[in-house]
């Protein structure tokens, strides 16, 4: 017994029987010895018999439920049931619904599957309808000897590479390589890749820190081609592109190196300014203070007390919110608002002027409409003594800024550090809305600002530091008077005091950089190409272009300004 078992385990007599020819002969003899209908007993999804038909017994079994046959088998049964061995698509639908009632109420998804099987299965072939045969639609028949090389309606991906170079070039967006990773082969069979870099990559590829395009394309860093550009396509189909020949680790390293160099190149121009913004708190903390000034009572009462307390509470509802309604930085207001003294009306900057710091909210909203200027002009005539006292108290804390705080990078860094040491929880949020908008736009741009926005941000900080007393206030910058035409936002009488005219720009757009008090900004701003936009009551009205500050001739204005109010 044991000897027989050992001999059976070590016997290799069965090895010659496992040849391919013996297996085919065994399968052929089994199919001939089996019953004729044995092919119909196969499981769903298996290859169907081209000559299979549906018997009445099998049709009766599946009258109540879903049949177990695949869609290809159902199509085969339907076509073989016709005398001509061909059917149209509508006839196939009708035959399936008549023999299998399940599909009558099964929706239309199975019809899509029937169409896909007819189109993609190579066992089915479309036969054009003869001219003498009236009707609609082509016939479908069963191809007993399907051609494996016959292309279907939707060829696989490997057949797409058989197209001519002209067709592939026409499909690409620029007539060249469709993507940066498209491959081309030389006649020697060495895989090479031609990288068509976009314009952004071409701009940043200059400089010592950039990665060579050939190194990225070839998959290995440091390798570049000294010959001419290789042909984009090769018509020799014997050399197929193989992804196994590419070292993806080196390729991904090259792309990461290229991306890093592009970031360094793009941020080099803004490095001097954006680097000092890394230690700043988030933009929602950049609020100005007002409670410290309001807590200090004025030493003397106002001469005409025409500003009641209820109006202070209702004043914020007259215009947009201070933060949300702030105008953008890139649209400075026109320079046509001048006073009889020759000083710019909006020279005090984004918020209310220094003399109005005790009551900024009503004066801000009071200056929003032209007809509201007159009742709010007299309360603004208070002396600046409380402001001077508050500035002195703040300067005593050691937070005073140098006069040249924005002249170089080092002083600007120190200024930001001093601002970070402020108690931001005790600062009012409503006075310096333009500084909030400047910082919000800078954060949206990821602090990659151009020269114009950097200057605007410096001017906003300059005005904020001047108003809060952290930087000594210098004398106002006088300018020659603009043309005598005064816009509706500055339509005040010449007898009104200067602080009441400064309140007009509390909701206006920021003025040019050279109009603010204090030291000159880091970058000058040209005011000739700045189209002005003012905010009247609840809608935007475009302003006519404003002449340069030094223009001596007067421009006639035919616009009916009374229609705005």
UniProtKB/Swiss-Prot annotation:
Location (main, coarse): nucleus
GO biological process: cell differentiation; male meiosis I; negative regulation of angiogenesis; negative regulation of blood vessel endothelial cell differentiation; positive regulation of vascular associated smooth muscle cell proliferation; spermatogenesis
Deletion consequences: Male germ-cell-specific conditional knockout results in complete male infertility and meiotic arrest in spermatocytes. Spermatocytes show aberrant chromosomal synapsis and DNA double-strand breaks (DSB) repair and significantly reduced expression of DSB repair-associated genes and meiotic arrest-related genes.
Biased composition (Acidic residues): 554-565
Annotation: DNA-binding region: 66-143
Summary of the tissues where the protein is detected: Spermtaocytes (at protein level). Expressed in adult brain, heart skeletal muscle, lung, kidney and gonads. Liver, small intestine, and spleen also show expression but at lower levels. In the testis, expressed from pachytene spermatocytes to round spermatids, but not in spermatogonia. In addition to the germ lineage, also expressed in Sertoli cells of the testis. In the ovary, only granulosa cells of the follicles show expression. In the brain, expressed in the piriform cortex, hippocampus, habenula and in the granula cell layer in the cerebellum.
Descriptive protein name: Forkhead box protein J2
Organism: Mus musculus (Mouse)
The encoding gene: Foxj2
């Amino acid at each position: 017994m044991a000897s027989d078992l050992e001999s059976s385990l070590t016997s290799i007599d069965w090895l010659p029987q496992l040849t391919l020819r013996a297996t085919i002969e065994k399968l052929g003899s089994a199919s001939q010895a089996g019953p004729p209908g044995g092919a119909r007993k196969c499981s769903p999804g298996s290859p169907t018999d081209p000559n299979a038909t549906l018997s009445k017994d099998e049709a009766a079994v599946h009258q109540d439920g879903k049949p177990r046959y695949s869609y290809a088998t159902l199509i085969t049964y339907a076509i073989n049931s016709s005398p001509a061995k061909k059917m149209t698509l509508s006839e196939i639908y009708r035959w399936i619904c008549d023999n299998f009632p399940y599909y009558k109420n099964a929706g239309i998804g199975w019809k899509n599957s029937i169409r896909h099987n007819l189109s993609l299965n190579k066992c089915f072939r479309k036969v054009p309808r003869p001219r003498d045969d009236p009707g609609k639609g082509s016939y479908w028949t069963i191809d007993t000897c399907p051609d494996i090389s016959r292309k279907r309606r939707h060829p696989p991906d490997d057949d797409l590479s058989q197209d001519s170079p002209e067709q592939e070039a026409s499909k690409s967006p620029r007539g060249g390589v469709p993507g940066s990773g498209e491959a081309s082969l030389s006649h020697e069979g060495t895989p090479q890749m031609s990288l068509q870099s976009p314009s952004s990559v071409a701009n940043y590829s200059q400089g010592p820190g950039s990665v060579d395009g050939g190194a990225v394309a070839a998959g290995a860093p440091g390798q570049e081609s000294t010959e001419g550009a290789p042909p984009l396509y090769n018509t020799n189909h014997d050399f197929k592109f193989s992804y196994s020949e590419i070292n993806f680790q080196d390729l991904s390293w090259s792309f990461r190196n290229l991306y890093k160099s592009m970031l360094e190149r793009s941020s080099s121009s803004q490095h001097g300014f954006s680097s000092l913004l890394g230690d700043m708190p988030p933009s929602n903390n950049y609020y100005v203070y007002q409670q410290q000034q309001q807590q200090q009572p004025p030493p003397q009462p106002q001469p005409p007390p025409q500003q009641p307390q209820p109006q202070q509470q209702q004043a914020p509802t007259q215009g947009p919110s201070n933060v949300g309604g702030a105008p953008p930085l890139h649209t400075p207001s026109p320079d046509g608002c001048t006073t009889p003294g020759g000083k710019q009306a909006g020279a005090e900057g984004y918020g209310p002027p220094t003399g109005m710091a005790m009551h900024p909210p009503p004066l801000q909203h009071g200056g929003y409409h032209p007809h509201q200027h007159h009742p709010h002009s007299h309360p603004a005539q208070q002396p600046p003594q409380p402001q001077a006292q508050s500035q002195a108290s703040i300067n005593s804390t050691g937070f005073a800024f140098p006069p040249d705080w924005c002249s170089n990078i080092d002083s600007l860094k120190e200024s930001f550090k001093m601002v970070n040491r402020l108690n931001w929880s005790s600062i009012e949020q409503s006075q310096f809305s333009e500084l909030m908008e400047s910082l919000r736009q800078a954060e949206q741009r990821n602090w990659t600002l151009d020269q114009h926005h950097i200057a605007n941000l410096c001017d906003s900080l300059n005005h904020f530091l001047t108003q809060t007393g952290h930087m000594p206030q210098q004398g106002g910058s006088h300018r020659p008077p603009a043309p005598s035409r005064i816009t509706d936002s500055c339509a005040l009488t010449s007898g009104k005091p200067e602080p009441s005219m400064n309140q007009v720009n509390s909701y206006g757009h920021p003025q040019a950089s050279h109009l603010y008090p204090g030291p000159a900004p880091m970058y000058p701003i040209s005011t000739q190409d700045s189209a002005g936009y003012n905010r009247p009551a609840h809608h935007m009205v475009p302003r006519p272009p404003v002449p340069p500050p030094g223009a001596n001739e007067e421009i006639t204005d035919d616009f009916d300004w009374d229609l705005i109010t």
